[in-house]
Design a protein with these regions (language model features):
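Helix-centric, low-specificity signal for extended rod-like, repetitive segments
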Residues: 1, 30-32, 112, 119
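N-terminal Lys/Arg-rich, disordered targeting/topogenic segments
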Residues: 1-10
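Low-complexity, intrinsically disordered/propeptide-like segments
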Residues: 4, 16, 31-33, 102, ...
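Hydrophobic membrane-insertion alpha-helices, especially the h-region
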Residues: 13-30
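Transmembrane signal-anchor/signal-peptide helices with a preference for the extracytoplasmic
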Residues: 25-45
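Alpha-helical segments in soluble extracytoplasmic regions
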Residues: 42-168
Length: 168
């Protein structure tokens, strides 16, 4: 009888190990999934904050242009405002490089960054137009503004698709 008990104990040991490994794998899977959700949520907050900063800075610049159009701001003042604006936009552009997007969102980050690059270039041309009065500078600025808008729309669509789990 004692030998039978020994065999039973030995046969239970591999089953216990296999059960522990399976439980460990399940715990790891759910932990990894939770961590991915947390990273995704943190990334979503970071990109939203960055987009809001860009939108606010853009709004201030547009407001200054409106004042300049009404002759409430001189050309020199507008150029100074524009140069500070470009500095701010370039700092915001660098923030895109600091983001660590989940793989599904990398395309949207590239497009949103491209949009801001177009905006910066557009505003450089606009400032050059203010300085020189050369209408071709204004036309180029407007073209780049359109490209910026298109890149931003594509970036937002890509972001929403990634959020919904749609392959890109």
């Amino acid at each position: 009888m004692k030998k039978r008990k020994a065999k039973k104990t030995k046969s239970k040991f591999p089953i216990i190990i296999i059960g522990a490994v399976i439980i460990g794998i399940i715990v790891f899977y759910f932990y990894s999934a939770d961590q991915a959700k947390i990273r995704g949520f943190a990334f979503g907050n970071e990109i939203q904050t960055l987009q809001e900063e860009i939108r606010n800075e853009q709004g201030q610049f547009i407001s200054s242009i409106a004042k300049w159009n009404e002759n409430a701001i001189s050309n020199e003042e507008m150029i100074g405002i524009g140069e500070k604006h470009l500095e701010t936009f370039n700092k915001l552009l660098n923030k895109y490089d600091e983001l660590q997007p989940p793989d599904a969102f990398s395309r949207s980050v590239k497009l949103l960054k491209l949009s801001l690059e177009y905006q910066i270039e557009s505003h450089e041309y606009r400032l050059e137009w203010i300085k020189t009065g050369d209408v071709t500078e204004l036309i180029r600025s407007q073209e780049l503004t359109q490209l910026s808008f298109e890149a931003e729309q594509a970036g937002l669509k890509s972001f929403n698709d990634a959020k919904a789990g749609i392959e890109q």
